[in-house]
């Protein structure tokens, strides 16, 4: 479960992804919206940091998904089934969805850590396609959260930081 954020602009995020991940982001975004809208129990996913990150900011996630669909369509990737499901969810839930962007987008350090850890992970997934992100691997901002866990996170999740601060 993931929403890749290698840029601060949703359109730039979509433009920067390879076709495989771009198409998957539409589906995963839908799944996250479904969980947040109470239309899916979500099981353990409801506590996943990618889900929690968008809680209360579903309209921001909607904008992210719209950008993914727009670029997928420009690239000739079929999105009809996903769009049909998204439209149905939108029509049922739009009024209950929260504001556009999560507060952490106003924190320059958090944003840099998110963008950099996402770029580093994309580079590690496909070094050829994401060669332009290679410098993210050694960037000081490539500092995932929870480094002391048995299996440290690969990404920086602001919701983990907030949760850990409360403990």
Label every model-predicted segment.
Residues 1-45, 51-167:
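Sequence termini and other peripheral, non-core segments
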